[in-house]
């Protein structure tokens, strides 16, 4: 599929995969709660990682890894990366940021963040399917291009601009943004006036830190967002 065709074809998350993962997450949250009750309510994110991975009895293409390094954003509990190789196919890696989760973890918030993030990453999976192996073998994402640019003397902002202007990311982040809008007090107004709700829309705010409101990237983001919002 050519890029312009991909841009016209909105991808959806892999609902079958998400349903299977949700069962794993629900079981793991219950098991981790038992661990907390037996350990004076003191978080151990390595234990949470172990529980999540051990409950993946069907060996779904996902792995949870605890990251003990500090993050720039103290509220970033989780990050995830979708990948594809010709040998292994599609896969997603989820990083649990221990320093941010310890003492802050809550089961409902954890699940909401994780499932939304996996929705984002499985949109990438479906994009990969449409692109095909021939394209993927030589494809460089916006993030990869940004890393190259930064290594050549660019800035963190250059990297982020390259990452967020990637058409694949615009689509996947639009799905996230639609979900955030639906959680506001007035979802329809948030869709019409996202500037008014910037404080409640982390995805929109992230893009606004890089792009002006009338930019091509913001317009495309909001176009996809409206489609996801109404679906």
Regions found by a protein language model. Name each.
Residues 25-59:
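Zn2+-dependent metallopeptidase catalytic core
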Residues 117, 122-125, 131-138, 181:
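Catalytic phosphate/metal-binding cores of nucleic-acid and nucleotide-processing enzymes, i.e., regions
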Residues 22, 28-32, 151-231:
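Long, well-structured alpha-helical subdomains associated
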Residues 71-113, 122-129:
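Active-site scaffold of zinc-dependent metalloenzymes
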Residues 11-26, 37-43, 62, 84, ...:
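Compositionally biased low-complexity segments enriched in polar/charged residues
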């Amino acid at each position: 599929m050519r890029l312009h065709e991909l841009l016209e074809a909105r991808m959806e998350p892999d609902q079958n995969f998400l349903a299977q993962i949700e069962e794993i997450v629900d079981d793991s949250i219950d098991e981790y709660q038992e661990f907390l009750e037996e350990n004076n309510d003191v978080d151990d994110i390595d234990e949470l990682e172990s529980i999540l991975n051990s409950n993946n009895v069907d060996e779904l293409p996902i792995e949870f890894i605890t990251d003990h390094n500090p993050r720039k954003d103290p509220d970033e509990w989780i990050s995830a990366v979708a990948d594809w190789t010709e040998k292994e196919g599609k896969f997603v890696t989820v990083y649990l940021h221990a320093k941010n989760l310890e003492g802050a973890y809550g089961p409902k918030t954890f699940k909401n963040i994780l499932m939304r993030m996996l929705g984002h990453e499985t949109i990438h999976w479906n994009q990969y399917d449409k692109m095909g192996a021939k394209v993927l073998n030589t494809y460089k994402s916006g993030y990869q291009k940004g890393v190259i640019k930064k290594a050549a003397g660019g800035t963190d902002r250059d990297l982020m601009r390259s990452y967020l202007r990637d058409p694949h990311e615009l689509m996947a982040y639009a799905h996230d943004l639609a979900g955030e809008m639906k959680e506001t007090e007035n979802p329809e107004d948030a869709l019409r006036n996202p500037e008014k709700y910037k404080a409640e829309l982390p995805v929109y705010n992230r893009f606004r830190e890089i792009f002006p409101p009338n930019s091509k990237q913001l317009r495309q983001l909001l176009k996809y967002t409206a489609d996801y919002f109404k679906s």
